[in-house]
């Protein structure tokens, strides 16, 4: 049976009217009733579990009690140190097998693990490398010696350089460090948000020359869909800037060409894997751009959605909120679709900040004013009661990416993540992984673990997991009839999962 779409506003029995105030012992019956009523409000609190699901839920509860009483509790530790502990967890292993629905917040440059980029892509012919003045790297595929440019004066053929160095394993490991944030000493290497964001953005730039090479991009997208499916994910909405794709001879393709390639790869992957439901693109631009540039990007997104209505889901603005321009700064550009009488759905990053009361902190309200379809991260939403109320009434889901929020130093102990408030109130939520390759993850299982065990705590149950997974289809950009089809497909996978785990 497919879960029905939750109502925008849920009316609860006002039990407080019936609670007697007493100086003596409170009524145990009233206490039990209040506890049950509060539990019914949480994410998954309205989900009725079958007997088989109840059995699995009891097993999960016992496992969670054991993990919460252990000497080291993974959600309280930086993910880079907690990862080995998580991978030993029986809960995590079960979550890997669980059908998780859709990944709705992943950036295209971080879809595939860096080991594949280094061990596969950089070993391909005609791959050049340059070491920059700011201790980063650039890559370029070319059929001739690349010309020097302002940030790269000397390009070296990687094949030749590896031979000279004589330690390919050590060299490859050093290359991986340029493409990921993962480190054994995260607190030492990243003492504050500025430092970690600087490395974060450098890694994006470093990977670009590899990923945007046309033959690599085709393989990369197929590989990325495969990694998601391996983690029991059936649908993807990928944020992409549609960077210019290039050929070995320097030919550069436009965005239409890149979208068509994405379409071809997705079609082939679905043909090879019929139980994968599909993928769409959310076109994204960096908030460091000027108003005129964003205007042009919005117009381009409108045209691309017109040409590819089944593939282009909408538009977003990316980049660090704290140092970037606000949504309100771009109000003229973001109002263009309405002025032109067209619909361009927005999927705004908003509230990825702990700077309460600043102009950046108002992005949450502005995202809702611009009628965003979902809120990316929404870390600060719990501090905005009106925005929280509006998003709930409008069924605007928050894309919760717990590992990203921890690694980028918004929160250290995930038990203190403000999404705990949202989960306790049953706020519309989906779980996603933001930039998996940057954090040393793949798919959604790691983030589901952190949300289920850390943020949700002991009260989060199988009903919570079931609702979060189903939410990812409900709150996708798919049209209503495809949501119904997707939910039916997901429900069959869920039922098989329950049957396989009695």
Where are the regions a protein language model picked out?
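Metal-cofactor-binding active-site regions of metalloenzymes
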Residues: 2-5, 17-502
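Sec-dependent signal peptide recognition
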Residues: 4-12
């Amino acid at each position: 049976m497919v879960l029905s779409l939750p109502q925008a506003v849920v009316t609860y029995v006002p039990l407080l009217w019936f609670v007697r105030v007493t100086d003596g012992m409170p009524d145990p019956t009233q206490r039990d009733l209040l506890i049950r009523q509060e539990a019914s409000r949480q994410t998954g609190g309205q989900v009725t579990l079958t007997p088989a699901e109840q059995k699995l839920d009891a097993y999960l509860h016992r496992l969670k009690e054991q993990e919460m009483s252990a000497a080291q509790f993974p959600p309280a530790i930086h993910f880079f140190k907690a990862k080995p502990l998580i991978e030993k967890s029986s809960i995590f292993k079960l979550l890997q097998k669980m059908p998780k629905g859709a990944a709705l917040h992943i950036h295209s440059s971080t879809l595939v693990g860096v080991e594949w980029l280094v061990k596969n892509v950089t070993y391909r012919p005609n791959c050049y490398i340059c070491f920059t003045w700011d201790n980063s790297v650039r890559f370029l595929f070319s059929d001739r010696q690349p010309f020097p440019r302002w940030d790269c004066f000397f390009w070296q053929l990687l094949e030749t350089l590896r031979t000279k160095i004589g330690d390919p394993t050590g060299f490859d490991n050093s290359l991986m460090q340029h493409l990921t944030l993962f480190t054994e000493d995260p607190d030492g290497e990243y003492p504050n948000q500025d430092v970690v964001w600087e490395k974060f953005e450098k890694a994006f730039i470093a990977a670009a020359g590899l990923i945007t090479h046309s033959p690599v991009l085709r393989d990369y997208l197929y590989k990325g869909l495969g990694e998601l499916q391996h983690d029991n994910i059936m649908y993807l909405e990928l944020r992409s800037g549609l960077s210019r794709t290039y050929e070995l001879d320097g030919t550069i393709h436009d965005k239409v060409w890149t979208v068509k390639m994405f379409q071809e790869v997705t079609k082939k992957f679905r043909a090879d894997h019929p139980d994968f439901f599909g993928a769409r693109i959310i076109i994204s631009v960096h908030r460091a751009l000027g108003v005129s540039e964003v205007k042009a990007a919005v117009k381009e997104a409108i045209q691309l959605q017109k040409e590819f209505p089944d593939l282009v889901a909408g538009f977003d603005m990316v980049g660090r909120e704290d140092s970037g321009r606000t949504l309100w700064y771009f109000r003229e550009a973001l109002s263009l679709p309405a002025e032109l009488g067209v619909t361009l759905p927005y999927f705004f990053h908003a509230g990825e900040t702990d700077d309460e009361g600043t102009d950046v902190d108002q992005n949450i309200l502005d995202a809702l004013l611009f009628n965003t379809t979902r809120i990316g991260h929404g870390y600060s939403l719990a501090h905005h009661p009106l925005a929280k109320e509006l998003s709930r009434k409008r069924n605007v889901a928050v894309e919760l990416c717990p590992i990203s929020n921890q690694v980028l130093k918004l929160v250290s102990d995930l038990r203190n993540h403000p999404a705990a408030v949202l989960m306790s109130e049953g706020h519309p939520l989906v779980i996603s992984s933001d930039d998996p390759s940057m954090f040393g993850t793949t798919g959604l299982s790691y983030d589901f673990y952190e949300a289920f065990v850390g943020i949700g705590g002991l009260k989060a149950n199988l009903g919570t997991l079931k609702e979060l997974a189903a939410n990812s289809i409900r709150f996708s950009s798919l049209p209503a009839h495809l949501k119904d089809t997707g939910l039916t497909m997901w429900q069959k996978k869920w039922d098989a999962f329950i049957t396989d785990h009695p």
